[in-house]
Amino acid sequence: MSVKSTVEQLSPTRVRINVEVPFEELKPDFDRAYKALAKQVRIPGFRPGKAPAKLLEARLGRGAILEQVVNDVLPARYSEAVTTSEVKVIGQPDIEITKIEDGQEFAFSAEVDVRPEIALPDYADLEVTVDAFTIGDEDIEEQLNSLRQRFGTLTGVERPVQEGDFVSIDLSATVDGQEVPEASTTGLSHEVGSGQLIEGLDEALIGLSAGESKEFTSTLVAGEHAGKEAVITVTVQSVKERELPEADDEFAQLASEFDTLEELKADLRSRVERVKKVQQAGEIRDKVLEALLEKTEVPLPEKVVQAEIDAVLHDAVHGFDHDEAKLAEALEAQGSSRAEFDKDTKEAAEKSVKTQLLLDAIAEAEGTQVGQEELTERILFQAQRYGMAPEQFIQQVQQAGQLGAVFADVRRGKALAGVVGKVKVTDSEGNTVDTAEMFGEPAAEPEQADAAQAGDAEKAAADSE
C-alpha cells in the first residue's frame, strides 16, 4: 500500500495525522462493498449476490456505495498511518474526511492524543523519609486477643447492652412519617461498637435491655431515600457476650501448631513484623511515586483526562438511577456539594493520568518486561480479591477488553519498584531502610548490563580454552 501521511504537532499531547489514499488502492474495497450489497439488495432477474455493480449503482447511487467504502476503509488506513508515522497514540481519534473525489483521491485527517515526551529525573537525587516501626508487647497482645476472640463463645446475658456485645435486633425506618420498607429488617445480628450498620445505631443500643426499643435519627445512604434523614426504631431481641478462652499453653495447642504460649507469641511477633514491613513498603512506594510526580513535568492529554472524569461520574450516578439531581442531594447530605465533587474528581483524574504516563515512560526507559508468571500472579490476586474463580475472572477481563490494562498495571508497578531501589530511603529515626528486601535489587543500568554480559562472554570463552 502507498498511503501517504504527515503529522502535525498540535500540542505536546495532541497531533493531527493527514492521510492521502490513492483511489486505485480502493478497488478491492469497492469489490467487497459491491459483493456485500448484492446480497442485501433484491434486483429482479438476479439471484441474491449476483447483481452486477452497474445495476447496484443505478439502484443505490454511486454516492451511497462510496460512503460505505470510505467508512469501511477508515479504521485500517488510520491504523496504517499511525504505524507508519510511529506516533504513540492514546484514545480514540477525531476523524474528518478532508477530500473525496470519485476516481481521483481520498484524504482524511485524524486528531488524536499522544504520549508526551517526558524528561525523567535522576532517581539517585530523590530522597524520601518514612515512619519507623517498632514491635511492642501491646502489638503481640492485640494479635493474641484477636485470636482468642476467634475461639470465643457467645453466652446470653440478662443485662443492658454494652460495647462489644452481640445483639439480635429489629430495625424499621420512616421518612417524613412514611415507612421505608427496604430499611426494615428483623432478627439482624450485630456486634455493638463495630460501626458496620447505620450511623448512630451503636450509641442507641448502649444501655438497652432485651425487649426494649429506642428511636434515633440517621441519614439513609442507599435506596430511593438516599441522602434523606430518617427516624430509625431499633428493638433489642437478645443480648450475648463473648467469653474468651484463657491465654495459656492449652489455648496455644488449640489455636495453633505450637505446644506453648511462648512459641505462639514468638510466631505472632514474626507475623506482626511482616505486616509492618509490608505497610512500610507501601508507604515507601507511595512516597517515591509522590516524589517522582513532584519532580517531573508531565503534559496531560485533555481528552484522556476527560474520559477518566466521565467514567467516575458514570459510576457515581449509576447508584442513583443515573439521576444527577439525586447524586447532588446525597453529596449535600454528606456535607459536600456537586462543585466539590467535580473539583475532586478532576484533580484525581489528572493525577491518575499523570501517574500512568510517568510510570509508562519509566518502564519504556528502563526496558521493563512482564513475564507470563507475573501476569498470571496478578490475575490470580485480582480474582481472589473479587471472590471469583480465575477462569471466570480472565473471561470477564477478556470480554471487557481489559487484559491490556492488567498487563500495563503490572508493568507500571514493576517499573516503580525498580525506581525505589535507586532512591535514598530513611526512616523517621534516621536509619537507612533496606529496600532490596522489600522490592528486590535495583536493575543494572543498560550500559552496566551490557558490560556485565560482555564480561560473562569473555569468561565463558576463557573457560572453554
UniProtKB/Swiss-Prot annotation:
Transmembrane segments: none annotated. The keyword Transcription regulation does not apply. One of its GO terms (biological process) is protein transport. Residues 456-465 have a biased composition (Basic and acidic residues). Residues 164-245 form the PPIase FKBP-type domain. One of its GO terms (molecular function) is protein folding chaperone. Keywords: Cell cycle, Cell division, Chaperone, Cytoplasm, Isomerase, Rotamase. Residues 440-455 have a biased composition (Low complexity). Its EC number is 5.2.1.8. InterPro entries: PPIase_dom_sf (IPR046357), PPIase_FKBP_dom (IPR001179), Trig_fac (IPR005215), Trigger_fac_C (IPR008880), Trigger_fac_C_sf (IPR037041), Trigger_fac_ribosome-bd_bac (IPR008881), Trigger_fac_ribosome-bd_sf (IPR036611), Trigger_fact/SurA_dom_sf (IPR027304). Pfam families: FKBP_C, Trigger_C, Trigger_N. Gene3D superfamilies: 3.10.50.40, Trigger factor ribosome-binding domain (3.30.70.1050), Trigger factor, C-terminal domain (1.10.3120.10). Residues 430-465 are annotated as: Disordered. It is found in: Cytoplasm. Its main location: cytoplasm. It comes from the Bacteria. It catalyses: [protein]-peptidylproline (omega=180) = [protein]-peptidylproline (omega=0). One of its GO terms (cellular component) is cytoplasm. PANTHER family: TRIGGER FACTOR CHAPERONE AND PEPTIDYL-PROLYL CIS/TRANS ISOMERASE (PTHR30560), TRIGGER FACTOR-LIKE PROTEIN TIG, CHLOROPLASTIC (PTHR30560:SF3). Belongs to the FKBP-type PPIase family. Tig subfamily. Consists of 3 domains; the N-terminus binds the ribosome, the middle domain has PPIase activity, while the C-terminus has intrinsic chaperone activity on its own. Involved in protein export. Acts as a chaperone by maintaining the newly synthesized protein in an open conformation. Functions as a peptidyl-prolyl cis-trans isomerase. HAMAP family: Trigger_factor_Tig. This is Trigger factor. It comes from Nocardia farcinica (strain IFM 10152).
